[in-house]
Structures are given as structure tokens and as C-alpha cells.
Amino acid sequence: MPANPNPAFAGLTAAAHAVQPRTVALRRRLHRHPELGLQLPMTRSAVLDELADLPLTVHRGESCSSVVAVLDGERPGPTVLLRGDMDALPLTEQTGLRYASKIEGSMHACGHDTHTAMLASAARLLSQRRELLTGRVLLMFQPGEEGDHGARHMISEGLLDAAGPAGTPSSAYALHISATMPSGSIQTRPGALMAAADVLRVTVHGRGGHASAPHDALDPVPAAAAMVGALQTMVTRRVSAQEPAV
């Protein structure tokens, strides 16, 4: 513990415990009403309700149900972006929880309801310390994380300019909950921490022929099968065991 800790952090743990019931309530509200993709009207409404009494400048997305909120500190300084995703997955919940999904075919199975509630509570805690903040905080509530390019939509609508010409974020932070870690712990490391899902598209061109003369045809199936095997082997033979790869 530093000899003279930043006063903005004084009592922060106790304050977080104080807002925990509110965080849990918002998370369960979102969990009951999960929404898919870019259009999340109920989710956005819940977020706006939670932010309504805070000293924030709020921007609503037009092409998607995004929310961007800006918290200005009392002194000039850099802009920090905090991001939380909001969309659910196309699954039917069968947990039996009293706050289980009420929407058939939609479930918060990846924790985005928790991420959204945590970000809203972070906005509240930071707002309580506004007079101690240097710079500003940009709060990014993102729809469409599960393959719908929600961040791209938000950037095209001016996310990075939401805090003004001098408010371009100098750093950005996000997190992801994990059921494999003890509750209350945080895991991080320098460099890459989580895998990114990239898309590789390959077209194999064949040539038809007669079944009696396969040697005159070009069968794409064996070639494609060999490529699948080679791509699987690439991770173990072309990437160091010390590097994160799946």
C-alpha cells in the first residue's frame, strides 16, 4: 500500500459493497430479459434507468442500442474508456433460477448481464468521486458483441469523439467474468489474455468427371480434408507452446 494513496480510492471497497445490492438487482433484471444482437431496447432502457441520476452526458446509438456516457472530472487530464458488452446468446435457459430468462431462445449464458451491471455500478462509484477525478471517463455499453460488430457500429457513430476533440481515449479497459476463477479474484497478465475469434475463408476449386475415370477429375474433398488436418496441426507445429493459441 503506498504511503500516500490516491484519495479517489479511499473507501472504494466499502462503497462497492454498499452498491452491491443495486448491482445484483440490475444484473437479475437483465438476466430475465436477455436480448440478441444489435437491437436491445429493454437492456438499453434498464441501463438508462440506472444512469439517470448520475452527473453524466449520455449518448444513445442510432444504428444499434448502444449507450455512451461521459463523466468529466474536476481537473483536466486523459480520457479512459471502460467497456461492457450487453447482448445475450441464442439459447433457451433451463437453470430453474427464480430470475431465469423469460424469453424463449435467448439467455445470458456468457455473463454480459453481469458485465453491464458492473459497468453501471462503476459509473456510480466514479460519479461519487467526480471531484477527485483528473480527466474523464468514457463508459461504453456495447450491443452486438457476439458476432454483430457492435463496437464497429459505435465507432462509426462517434464513440471515440463522444468526450470532445480533446477527449480521445488514451487507454481502454474491459473484463470478462469466469466461472473457473474464485469469486472476488482478478486475473490479468501482460500481453494477450483472451483468445480472439478470427475467420478464415478458403475456396477449393475442383473439376467434375466420370466415376469411371476419377483420375481425369479434380476432387476437392481430399484436398479440403487435408487442409483441415493441416490447420489443426499448425497450432502445435508452427506456434510456440509458450504463446497463447487455440
Task: Go through each PLM region and give its residues.
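Acidic/His- and Gly-rich active-site-bordering loop/insert found
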Residues: 2-108, 117-133
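Small-residue-enriched segments and motifs
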Residues: 56, 244-246
